[in-house]
Design a protein with these regions (language model features):
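Local cysteine-cluster metal-coordination motifs and their immediate loop/turn environment
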Residues: 65, 87-117, 145-150
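Iron-sulfur (Fe-S) cluster-binding modules
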Residues: 1, 16-27, 47-56, 117-155
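FNR/FR-type flavoprotein reductase catalytic core
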Residues: 1-91
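Short, basic, helix/turn surface patches
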Residues: 32-37, 57-62, 108-118, 135-136
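Alpha-helix boundary/interfacial micro-motifs
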Residues: 74, 80-81, 96, 112, ...
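Short amphipathic alpha-helical patches
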Residues: 43-44, 69, 95-99, 124, ...
Length: 155
């Protein structure tokens, strides 16, 4: 059996809903603002399922780092194996540039060659989030300076 918990900030960001329903025996839908499914976080639904007696051999978490961090914190509490799919910046795909460097179990790993899937209980999410924020200012600037070719009005 496959149980899926899918979460989005709001209804207008929902993707792959039908695909999750087709691949799952149970789907819990969560949104931060309550415009889709149940208002709350994926960890709320996961905790509820576990505490209601559902047994899981493995949890797979894919999404924002902060979400995966707290899914792992929860599953560790219940001793449930958890795999996370890490997607840091990958430049050359060989591990030589170090752009996708992660700390997993106290060791340096490269998502492009060693992953992208890792034991979530061993990933240092704080370091991964810190590294992920490296280009935040550059990305914000790129959004602000985006091409206005399709804008109705250019200021």
């Amino acid at each position: 059996m496959v149980h899926s918990i899918i979460g989005f900030r709001s209804q207008d960001l929902v993707i792959l809903e039908k695909e999750f329903e087709a691949a799952s025996t149970l789907v819990k839908k969560m949104s931060d603002d309550g415009t889709w499914g149940t208002k709350g976080l994926v960890t709320d639904a996961l905790r509820q399922l576990i505490e209601s007696g559902e047994q899981y051999d493995q949890v797979i978490a894919i999404g924002p780092l902060i979400m995966m961090k707290f899914v792992c914190k929860l599953t560790k509490e219940f001793n449930i194996k958890t795999v996370v799919s890490m997607n840091p910046i990958m430049i050359d795909g060989t591990g030589m540039c170090g752009g996708c460097r992660l700390t997993v179990g106290g060791e340096t790993k490269f998502a492009c060659v060693d992953g992208p899937d890792f034991d979530g209980h061993l990933v240092d999410f704080d370091v991964a989030m810190q590294r992920g924020a490296t280009y935040r200012d550059f990305e914000a600037h790129a959004r602000e300076e985006a091409c206005n070719l399709f804008a109705k009005e250019v200021q």
